[in-house]
């Protein structure tokens, strides 16, 4: 339907930027919240969920730096909104949302610094898709990995990372960010315990029958890594 067309195009645009950066041997940087005149639920930042949605989807698909739309907002009739400061030079509603998301990205970046991304993809309407060479395909994505998504209640984007024998998976809620709905995901974990990074903090969680069940918040993301591997 139209919504999934927009969402898949959103992912493919990011994937194409990533491919160009890789071909040029450059780190990938992306621009978030530049304009909200088209599908504002994705591109706005009036709520934390909207800002986190943009940032973590870009981060999951390879960005290691993000530019935010931060100069004075043009007239509202121009259909541009959610700058970090208003036309009067005052902090806008987006300011605190972006500040919180930036702190989480910084903490996550330090956590992932020695990891290498080995595959990325999405689950859209229950269908697993691989993101490769700038396109979204209906091919299986995980293979024989110690961590992988088994099921997702709603749409998610993910990337699998490796550090030697250690693996981890970054999962971002790709559901409508203004809905406020949680998104239940089930992750295969080849360990009795997993380290779960969320909201700038890491906690250890027991895994029942080799699985971890977690409810992602609106716009939220988690990084999961088996303990003791």
What are the functions of these language-model segments?
Residues 188-202:
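Solvent-exposed beta-hairpin/edge-strand motifs
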Residues 3-17, 45-52, 94-101, 183-187:
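Well-ordered, non-membrane alpha-helical segments in soluble/globular domains
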Residues 14-49, 77-85:
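Active-site clefts of carbohydrate-active enzymes
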Residues 49-103, 118-128:
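Aromatic/acidic polysaccharide-binding cleft in carbohydrate-active enzymes
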Residues 207-229:
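C-terminal beta-strand-rich structural cap/linker in extracellular carbohydrate-active enzymes
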Residues 1-9, 34-48, 87-90, 175:
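The substrate-binding groove and active-site-proximal loops of carbohydrate-active enzymes
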Residues 27-32, 59, 65-69, 170-171:
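Structural recognition of the beta-strand scaffold that forms the well-ordered cores
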Residues 123-192, 219:
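Carbohydrate-binding surface patches
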